[in-house]
A protein has these predicted regions:
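N-terminal pro-sequences and low-complexity stem/linker regions of secreted or lumenal proteins
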Residues: 1-173
Length: 173
């Protein structure tokens, strides 16, 4: 148990940064053994999804530390054009795609970097259905980024919103 106002102990750090054993996550473990994956993720900026995603793909969050505050969502569209890993792959002649869920309607990755990725929206941003088809046929690009669905019954591995409140003892939480 963490103590308020006290420096965490080494054991408490281990709990916070702990993970799962391969046996606990057989599907992910199988994927990790067969493909290049990140098994130790350290955020470029300790913040929310958009700044972290931007830092991951473009090595900058443009100084933004929140998804929406201090400029709204428009700040992402108005951000300076900054090359992304996708642009570098394009320059190197390597294939790439961003796969996103149809329910989301647009790729957040594409929106965050619209200034430099808009020319590729029709050619390199595809549905998860297309991902399944590409994978089944053995036609995945050299680099694939699978974007989780972050709205409409999300599958982004964050805990569901309001889960405790919806449970049997929700009134007690």
């Amino acid at each position: 148990e963490l103590k308020e106002g006290a420096q965490p102990t080494e054991e408490e750090y281990r709990v916070i940064m702990g993970g799962f054993t391969p046996e606990m996550l057989p599907v992910f473990s199988t994927i990790a053994r067969g493909f290049a994956v990140f098994d130790r993720w350290f955020a470029g900026v300790p913040s929310q999804t958009f700044p972290n995603r931007s830092f991951f793909h473009a090595s900058t969050s443009h100084g933004f530390v929140t998804n929406k505050n201090l400029g709204g969502y428009d700040k992402w569209i108005d951000a300076p054009a900054t090359p992304t890993v996708f642009n570098r792959l394009e320059e190197a002649g390597l294939s790439w795609r961003v796969y996103y869920d149809e329910q989301q309607m647009v790729s957040f990755t594409g929106v965050l970097h619209a200034a430099v990725l808009q020319p590729y929206w029709k050619s390199n941003f595809r549905s998860m259905e297309q991902f399944h088809d590409d994978a089944a046929k053995g036609h995945l690009p050299a680099y694939s980024f699978i974007e989780p669905r972050m709205i409409f019954n999300h599958n982004d591995m964050h805990p569901p919103w309001g889960t405790l409140r919806e449970g049997e003892s929700g009134g007690d939480t």
